[in-house]
Amino acid sequence: MKRYISNITWVTTFLLAGIIVLSSCDTELDLTDPSYQTPESYFQNSDELKAATNAIYSQLSAAQLFAREWFFLHDLRSDVIAAGGGQLEASRRQILIGASSPTNNVMNDVWNGLYNVINRTNVVIQNAPNVEDNPSLRDRLVGEAKFLRGWAYYELVSFWGPVPIYTSVISNPEQFQPRSPEDSVYARVINDLEDAAAVLPETYDDADRGRATWGAAKAMLGRAHMQQLDFEAAKSHFQEIIDSGLYSLTDNYFDNFKEETEFNQESIFEVVFIDKGDDSFNWDYTGDGANAAQSTARAQEYNPVAWRNTIPSDTYLNNFEHTETGAPKTDPRLEMSVYKTGDTFNGGQSTLTSDMQNGNSSTLHGEEIKIGWRKYTLLYKLSFDQAQNVFRGNNHRMIRYAEILLNMAECENETGNIGQALNYLNQVRNRSSVDMPEYPTAQYPAANKMDVVEIIMHERMAELGGEEYRNRDILRWRELGYFDEDPLPYFQEGRDELLPIPSTEINNNPELGSGSINPQNPGY
């Protein structure tokens, strides 16, 4: 059985479920429950502070975020995914085709989930000074909370741009905030992550695997600086991770997506899920309650023989180097990322047929064929019948070392070091189970910076496609002017860089437009 933080369940009775609107009442009836604990009465020792910190992780693995809607929102805002067929729900299809509205429930769930994370982090940070029995643990828990708050604001600013910033628990409507400029949000992100990196440990024992580490904070700092196009600053954080020697690439690329190989040497931060043995799912969406031990819907949603709501896009599939297009070798990562009709699954005991797969076909090198996701879907060990209902506990690898090497390659190229950029790219290609020819190649020359930009775009899609990176890659490269034609066919400049602010936020937060920034993003 897995042993780590998600085995600890805490009923967050007193935590706000988000940024709430308070209402007044004229009655003077005293309804106080003498057994009810407030934050002031609860936080008396480090065990209670740790329980509150665990509640943040519980929200992270809830359906609003990593268990369901987070991966959908990222993937549907990219060009690596396509609709599996008519079974893709309307709210998800709207995002895929660029028809998002302020009432879209997928988008709103992610917004609410991120602010729920922020609220829970603020509870921990605000009440930590009351805890005096174990200062070193207290400070580490505050570091974990700041890491998670920094991550949440990074997600918010990436999707919505200017957003309200809260660094304390909201107790009345007068504390609502207007939208802060993107630079201010990034400053909040960087401040939190720097504080976290200063106190978080490099590793944990098995009982605490899944908690934020120094390496995770450094990786997020690098990401934040990259999105601001500050590649020198980003490079310094990635260099520290590389120099630490804490991480290395797994020999087997597919080990990054299997349940049996979680927390391997490549993993820097994972969102933890639990296989409860009954294929049940917590549809509560907030990670609370008696069923808070959380499985993930990823394998159910993307599995070729389950719901198959999404499939790999033709753009993604045809990005891989292949002998049919003149490459000296077909990239093995294609076979380790997707299932094609005719492939075997269930430990080689079953063969995937077209009629097992509901919905659309793909076009790979001119051939029309049904293809589905292999990453995270667990079909490698499941029979066809078992895969019909598959809510399991496969952890999501939010940060892995290959990303750090590819990030470093981009930073080196952007700061004029083409040779170093190629070195980091080739480290990724030299993984023993991949073993692709080193750059430059005949198909991918490296005579100048823009040649290497093309290599980076290609290699990031091959290595990280379907892992929720591409959305931010597109945002970054679009801002740098690197696209002759935008990867998203619906893209309208001045509108589709950002998602619409949820209508519930506009209706419930009267301060949203009180500053210099309009309450809604342009075009919505």
Predicted regions and their residues:
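Bacterial N-terminal signal peptides
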Residues: 11-21
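Structural register within alpha-helical repeat arrays
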Residues: 142, 149, 214, 221, ...
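An aromatic- and glycine-enriched ligand-binding surface/loop that stacks and positions planar moieties
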Residues: 26-87, 194-195, 211-360, 484
